[in-house]
């Protein structure tokens, strides 16, 4: 209603495919069109490696869910992983073949439509982000997702949702910004300064700043 866009994360499996959820999604698509983007976690374009991560009989169900979303005109994105050491070019080619076969409206060469996540190993040392990084990398702090976006999560069993800086930090309580977007805009102290996020987490350096990744749709 205010001109914002929303990126909804899902595995597109049975919970999303319930009639009540499908009906709600169709209503949201009708109201918001392409400003609503559904990003589906498909760890690998092939069944074997996807199910190595997600478990047996998960691949077909996810494909079925993406097929439904594509058939009903949703703006789509895919989240894959680079865990197996396959090159980015090979991964994008593989997802591209799958998208063409299924008729999914996804440009696999667009890093926002096919996000390939590196492994987030917190035991690995990463360089600290300094002000000099922005000049060296020819980047601006405003380009990082948490400069202009927030993630809202309703955890199982929780009474209220929680606002977080981004999709990479769903479980770290130090990065919880409040229960509403208004509270998040005022978050101060710890990892925040008047609603702004301090880039102190290892994922900030490895993926967003030095890695050049983006979760934004």
Indicate where each model-derived feature is located:
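Short, surface-exposed linear patches
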Residues: 3, 29-31, 60-66, 99-101, ...
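Short, conserved loop/helix-junction motifs that constitute active-site signature segments
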Residues: 26-33, 69-73
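Short, flexible loop/turn motifs enriched in small residues
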Residues: 33-34, 144
